[in-house]
Amino acid sequence: MSYNIFADYYDVLMQNVGYKERSDYICELMKRHNHEFGITLDLACGTGSLTMELAQKGVDIYGIDASAEMLSEAMQKSSEKGLNILYLRQKMQSLNLYGTIDTCICTLDSINHITNEKDVAKAFERVAFFMNQDGVFMFDVNTVYKHEQVLANNTFVYETDKVFCVWQNTLRENCVTDIDLDFFEEENGIYYRTSESFSERGYSREKLTEMLVNAGFELEAVYGDMSFDEPKADEQRLVFVARMKNPINKEC
């Protein structure tokens, strides 16, 4: 899907994410793993909020996303901040870069948006293909627990000064959650409705680790969200840190 409607409201709905704090966490994570950022890719960068936070910290970073609408927002925001950041439109599973990278980050459950297991494996292989030896791949995912116990078949309502959003979930087999969003925006006393639908899939820690190893990575750690501790049983987000050690898919 293109996220053409969702892109208009993404930053409003994600305003409590805390991108500065998340960028601080990523920087500390890299220090703890004795890794210098070098050339960094923000994979599935969305509207570029985290990309810009890291760029402002001096990280040599560029962003890739499959949504033209998301990238349009990212480019406009970067321009307004006076940041010269390269943004490219590509899918994760068909990643094709101009050169190698030292670091790849992929945050805020972007991996979950790939609902085909083979495509996740392909995305890992493409990151590995362009990753320098000893490069670090850091990503997070919504957990199976979150899909089954939190998202499940529940409905959520989000209200801000700009938009009213109804978020409806339908949990299917293989831990796939179909998400239907209805946005209501007021203009001159009249409410206008727009809708967007997409799906996410929960993957087990074991399956993601297997796919990383098959792509040539060595798993260094799995943390709870914004933490350096072992994840709890009811953790809603996992953070994976893997290092490129055994490139085995250079013909992918």
Give residue spans per PLM region:
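Conserved class I S-adenosyl-L-methionine
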Residues: 1-38
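Class I SAM-dependent methyltransferase SAM/SAH-binding core
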Residues: 41, 49-94
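Conserved glycine-rich SAM-binding loop
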Residues: 46
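A short acidic, Gly/Pro-enriched loop at the edge of an enzyme's catalytic core
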Residues: 96-103
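Residues lining the SAM
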Residues: 107-109
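SAM-dependent methyltransferase
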Residues: 118, 138-211
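A short glycine-rich, Lys/Arg-flanked "PGG" loop and its adjoining helix->strand segment in the class I
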Residues: 121-133
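C-terminal lobe and adjacent flexible extensions of AdoMet/dcAdoMet transferase-like proteins
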Residues: 205-252
